[in-house]
Amino acid sequence: MEGKKVLLVDTDPQGSLTISMGWQQPDELSTTLSTLMQKAMNDQPIQPGEGILHHAEGVDLIPANIELAGLEVALVNSMNREKMLKQVLDSAKREYDFILLDCMPSLGMLTINALAAADAALIPVQAQYLSAKGLEQLLQTVQKVRRQINPKLKIEGIL
């Protein structure tokens, strides 16, 4: 992806991608995905570039931390709850060639938000029985999201 502008979005409350990218204390960051989604839920404007960290290797990151777990609970009672992440990313779409969303292995509201905001899903799966069962549920969820929320969503591949 040399020469392309890439934004990584950590949608995991454990902040695994954030930590892997070198931010070892995600709970100390002033602005994270949780902050931005809370703004979207409250109809507050999100400024261009707000909450985006710049990595030395040339990719940008919207980090996550444990606050995202509480936000996921709040999403349940929110209007348009499936599209909050899409609202956050709409302002960034023009600035990037690729936006990659890293999801936790769960089918909660954050994953639904990621599928609603995505053009395509690339699904990593371990070659194990329980992973295969989880894949079956995820594929059913993708079909529902495609029917009800995001008809453009496609499965790019399963690894």
Regions found by a protein language model. Give the residues of each.
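P-loop NTP-binding core
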Residues: M1-L159
